[in-house]
Amino acid sequence: MGKIIELNEALANQIAAGEVVERPASVVKELVENSIDAGSSKITVSVEEAGLRLIEVTDNGLGLEKEDVALALRRHATSKIKDSADLFRIRTLGFRGEALPSIASVSQMTIETSNAQEEAGTKLIAKGGTIETLEPLAKRLGTKISVANLFYNTPARLKYIKSLQAELSHITDIINRLSLAHPEISFTLVNEGKEFLKTAGNGDLRQVIAAIYGIGTAKKMREINGSDLDFELTGYVSLPELTRANRNYITILINGRFIKNFLLNRAILEGYGNRLMVGRFPFAVLSIKIDPKLADVNVHPTKQEVRLSKERELMTLISKAIDEALSEGVLIPEALENLQGRVKEKETVSVQTELPLQNNPLYYDNVRQDFFVREEAIFEINKNDNSDSLTEQNSTDYTVNQPETGSVSEKITDRTVESSNEFTDRTPKNSVSNFGVDFDNIEKLSQQSTFPQLEYLAQLHATYLLCQSKEGLYLVDQHAAQERIKYEYWKDKIGEVSMEQQILLAPYLFTLPKNDFIVLAEKKDLLHEAGVFLEEYGENQFILREHPIWLKETEIEKSINEMIDIILSSKEFSLKKYRHDLAAMVACKSSIKANHPLDAESARALLRELATCKNPYSCAHGRPTIVHFSGDDIQKMFRRIQETHRSKAASWKDFE
């Protein structure tokens, strides 16, 4: 007797459901796409328990005829293609005829539908893919499909379901993408009876962007357009100042279908060129109309992977359109607009400084672990300009990003005289005047870490410190060196977060898309480890009323956004990695940059601090802080050491 058997239809549908119905969001996607294909102008999605208990999709589309309702639950039954030729000119979102039977096989499904041609509607009830009831229904134009108790008959699938908040976030993301793809349709998402998202459906894509990402984001989006013989490109991209740490905010649409394509993502970044910082990604919504013959959507059951003909030409079109859009306007960030994230604007009076920092050597304050212009230079400028007060502007000082009022001389004096509590722990008890360095202790640490005993010679290009020792010549990157010093300080500091808080006179507001808001609402307690306490405030917003004393107020907004990005982009949150990323970020931003001259005294102080580090050889991002040219290397460069012909001949003899 043969061993091969034909599986029954119910089992075959459950197997197919493994590909089509991965999670509740997959059900929402398939049902809403069917509603879009039915010509709906209004679609409402209601969920309970993140879709596991109930998913209900209601539309005002064409509806189904009575004889088609039962047939819709048969595998490979569809109204969207009729022959193989149709497979290569698909304009609908669905075409396989697998979604409804697959969903019905792992749930309890109810379909209520009617169309304009029939006097009454039809109601179908199915359980596990088996039709139990098929009866007439009072007429209501459109269709309502309810999916209850998802995966009730496949409990093993429930083991792989994440938290309800995570599943709800995926559902919200699906609705967000479909709303961006079809601004002409009004979408409403309801969770547990509460409205989560609503779009106007008036065809204005920018209004949809505002509904999803917030008005502030929509204001910073630039419209793009482009076309050639094969493609028509429209959409919006964000100004370079508005970025995130991952690609989740890039939406690419092919004929109204959300797709994922690495090369098209790369084309978007190429369009920005060097306007974007490394590791940052823009907001983008690109809608591409293409001849269906040039796109093969029959690649994967989810239909998110699409093979494109003339892909390189499309990449060029995208890059060119973005570059032209960003080149047309002024890209200087609006300072006042960027302050709108505050609940109240601070009223401050600042005076523009005339201090040419680039031309004045900086000195290193070991207590503050930072670089400052010498007081004599400031007093000289004060004397020459007859100015009573100037605003200190030191771009290398992490604590000063916005102008401050008051006398510069007073501020510098305060900084050099006062002992900052922040750095007390890193300042050796037995300090030498001027630098506060315990040379005996440093020597021991240097020996333990095998860090060379360096003699400072000069500064090269206002960026590198030229040093020597008995082992040869050394070049030290001043930015990487201080970044390593500050990284080790901040890593310890963040690991021992003080609960001391500074109340903000003007609290900060952080607006997120609904799907990100859901995730952060679940994980915001993780920020407590860093002394950051966010409260839910209004729709899709968090408010920060106070900040930890270790976080400077001038960097609050940027730093908190970086923390949020880390949490949202990490599938598994690691406090250790989080502290590393945060410490690396703060250290990099607050360290002295290239092209800043240092005097010899300050350069030596920086080298001594570097020698005390646990790992003085690389910065927090892995770049080397120091490179070495041995005596032999230098002699070889000047051909003082040469290999003889005899030695080469001997080496060839070894191979015989």
UniProtKB/Swiss-Prot annotation:
Polar residues: compositionally biased ranges: 387-410
Gene Ontology molecular functions: ATP binding; ATP hydrolysis activity; ATP-dependent DNA damage sensor activity; mismatched DNA binding
One Pfam family matching this protein: DNA_mis_repair
UniProt cross-references to Gene3D superfamilies, sorted A to Z: 3.30.230.10, Histidine kinase-like ATPase, C-terminal domain (3.30.565.10), MutL, C-terminal domain, dimerisation subdomain (3.30.1540.20), MutL, C-terminal domain, regulatory subdomain (3.30.1370.100)
Alphabetical UniProt keywords: DNA damage, DNA repair
Any one of the GO CC terms: mismatch repair complex
Membrane-spanning residues: none
UniProt region (Disordered), positions on chain: 385-427
GO annotation terms (biological process): mismatch repair
Amino acid composition bias (Basic and acidic residues), ranges on this chain: 411-427
PANTHER family found in the cross-reference section: DNA MISMATCH REPAIR PROTEIN MLH, PMS, MUTL, DNA MISMATCH REPAIR PROTEIN MLH1
Record-linked HAMAP family: DNA_mis_repair
Assigned protein family: Belongs to the DNA mismatch repair MutL/HexB family.
Protein name: DNA mismatch repair protein MutL
Annotated gene: mutL
